[in-house]
Amino acid sequence: LINQMEARDFIRQISNLTEQQFSFQNPILDVTVGKYRINAVHQSIGRVNNRQALTFSIRIASLEPKITDDSGFVSRELSSLFEVLIYSHCSMVIGGLTGTGKTEFQKYLLRKMNEKDRVVIIDNVLELDQVRLNSDCDINSWQVDDRSPNSSIQTLVKNALRSNPDWLIVAEARGPEMLDVFNSMLTGHPIITTIHAQNMESMPIRMTRMIM
């Protein structure tokens, strides 16, 4: 176990390394360092046993594919179906709870894309960029910075359409940018994105509420 002083020192070093502000005014840190995704909440809003406390979590991203055609996660029939959907440039929205493998499934679909496909990935933490190790696609990764309107998800989605990609991958849609995702689909640019949802039936309502 580590104490609060050690935790604060560790997160301070991470924020300095990634050149991200972490303070009372910027109380949430969400960054990637190598294969580690780190999310921290400042002590100004974090509580443990009713006391102010910095809290953080570390998620280790696997550099090796967790979902493959041989992993048993996808049946042969489903694998063939996804290959047809990718070949036909069909847009897809992946829904599920936190930790259910939405990002890993995105990576699985990315690896099925044609090596000549030009792919633009829009991500907060560049976790999807690791698929380069197992893909021959022309991948361009853009990192979202919510502190600047010029690099928000909405702005980057609109700019991506000017780049005429074969695929636009939005790592996660969380709010009004879902409208830009829909508009992109309507213009013929296929998109793959993820959302948090309880089940498939709740996904249309969830997406509608993001837009409204």
What is each residue range found by the language model?
Residues 2-89:
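P-loop NTP-binding catalytic core
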